[in-house]
Amino acid sequence: MTVRIAINGFGRIGRNVVRALYESGRRAEITVVAINELADAAGMAHLLKYDTSHGRFAWEVRHEREQLFVGDDVIRILHERTLADLPWRELGVDVVLDCTGVYGNREHGEAHIAAGAKKVLFSHPGSNDLDATVVFGVNQNELRAEHRIVSNASCTTNCIIPVIKLLDDAYGIESGTVTTIHSAMNDQQVIDAYHSDLRRTRAASQSIIPVDTKLAAGITRIFPQFNDRFEAIAVRVPTINVTAIDLSVTVKKPVKASEVNQLLQKAAQGAFHGIVDYTESPLVSIDFNHDPHSAIVDGTQTRVSGAHLIKTLVWCDNEWGFANRMLDTTLAMAAVGFRLDASASTKL
């Protein structure tokens, strides 16, 4: 079965989803039938072909009127502002990947379904009333056919949750703090300009900028047992891609740094292969650009204090890794089938 998807929003994540689909060789499993984006077709084609972070796309890209051609594939281009007007039923869409960053609650998901989509996957955490929030590699096996409106969480949640699970299963986490060192994003300014967040009025290329984060809430959404036991802060730094996360946890069992690294390296080679990677090479952020893993543990930075306080540094390509997980979750949603009875929905 080939899953027919539509993409709503062709920004950083939407474009990387298309690139990842073609580069990963999954076109026999997933077909993009339509992209809804308010920008014009010429701009869409150009930014798909040329990307400052990820380089030139290897596939031929062109557009004619309201059609985007990727190799021999034809993708319909839409410019609808209203979700109810999207022709998902006409196009036979199985799953909508909503990558706008604007929509993310149950009402928005139901609008896609009313327009004819069978399921919806949001590219950000979304509201608490969705059917499921999935961190692929950790809880995708809990998906059911009735889970129609799903969130793929965030790039940072996908990065840190597998590591938290591994440490908790092995040593028992008491509490933790997280600092996200995140590349600049397009909600920041090129030069000083107005923004509702006064820190984000400042030029992104000239400062390390503290911003709000809901990562702690994202952790407890996946692991409710950690409610009020994790806190998170975030800063944006003057790079355009790749993120590092500084994770500190207190654990019940005494442990050594070498044992932590052995645990994480074994997981990267085994149960979490393809999701978690492990390195002890002397690398910097640019070296993780275009890395498809959700998390890359930097074993050179693991520390243990007093046998119970663990500090780790985890890298991720916040665009490419997350785009690959969007594809993984899409296939997982399709694999459990499509149940169209809305009353049967049960929350994960």
Curated annotation (Swiss-Prot):
Q: Which residues form the signal peptide?
A: none
What Gene Ontology molecular-function terms does this entry list?
Answer: erythrose-4-phosphate dehydrogenase activity; NAD binding; NADP binding
**Localization in the cell:** Cytoplasm
Q: Which residues bind NAD(+)?
A: 12-13, 81, 318
Bilayer-crossing residues are: none
Q: Where is this site: Activates thiol group during catalysis?
A: 182
Question: Recorded E.C. number(s)?
Answer: 1.2.1.72
Which reactions fall under this protein's catalytic activity?
D-erythrose 4-phosphate + NAD(+) + H2O = 4-phospho-D-erythronate + NADH + 2 H(+)
Q: Which UniProt keywords apply?
A: Cytoplasm, NAD, Oxidoreductase, Pyridoxine biosynthesis
The family database entries (HAMAP family) matched by this protein are listed as: E4P_dehydrog
The record's similarity note reads: Belongs to the glyceraldehyde-3-phosphate dehydrogenase family. Epd subfamily.
Q: What is this protein called?
A: D-erythrose-4-phosphate dehydrogenase
Its gene? epd
